[in-house]
């Protein structure tokens, strides 16, 4: 199941965050883990629990966005996650690379720890999100909360623009 949190973050904040991540020099091709280089896409780790030199400003921005998403979720009666980042990153995808259908956190999270992913676009790009076989429309300001153990991927992107998405790993509320 995917939970939509609509109009959670104003476009101006997303545009500013997009500019910040575009200017970042720490992008890597580490994901998907274990894939051949041709199948990898640029990913920027914003927060992973460690002290990332030079990432404090982006980390603060990402925390602010997460709190805005959490606040909007509560206003909508959706109390499903804890607003504490376990991980946060940005990814770039475009129409020239088909996304891989994958799962996250099968082996890097303890079995008794329930986590959720939160995904949002920083700009409109003509692509959406596929989760457990169902397509979900993506628009800037709307964030999706989903189970990362279910197969998911970006749908095909139909514009010339590169898509920049922000995604979080957070603890699920269990009661």
Regions found by a protein language model. Give the residues of each.
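Substrate-binding/catalytic groove segments of enzymes
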Residues: 27, 126-130, 152
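Short coil/turn motifs at secondary-structure junctions
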Residues: 95, 125, 171-175
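Conserved metal-binding segment of the jelly-roll/cupin
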Residues: 137-152
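Conserved short histidine dyad/triad with adjacent acidic residue
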Residues: 90-110
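Non-heme Fe(II)/2-oxoglutarate
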Residues: 1-81
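A short hydrophobic beta-strand segment most commonly corresponding to one strand
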Residues: 116-120, 160-175
């Amino acid at each position: 199941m995917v939970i939509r949190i609509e109009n959670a973050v104003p476009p101006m904040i997303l545009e500013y965050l997009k500019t910040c991540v575009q200017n970042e020099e720490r992008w890597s091709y580490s994901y998907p883990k274990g894939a051949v280089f041709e199948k990898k896409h640029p990913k920027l780790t914003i927060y992973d629990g460690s002290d990332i030199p030079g990432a404090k400003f982006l980390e603060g921005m990402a925390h602010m966005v997460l709190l805005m998403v959490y606040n909007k979720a509560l206003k909508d009666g959706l109390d499903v996650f804890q607003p504490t980042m376990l991980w946060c990153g940005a990814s770039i995808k475009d129409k020239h690379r088909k996304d891989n259908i994958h799962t996250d956190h099968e082996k890097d999270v303890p079995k008794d720890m329930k986590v959720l992913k939160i995904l949002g676009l920083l700009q409109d790009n003509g692509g959406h999100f596929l989760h457990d076989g169902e397509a979900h429309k993506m628009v800037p300001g709307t964030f999706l909360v989903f189970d990362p153990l279910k197969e998911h991927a970006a749908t095909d992107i139909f514009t010339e623009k590169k898509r920049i998405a922000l995604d979080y790993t957070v603890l699920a509320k269990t009661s």
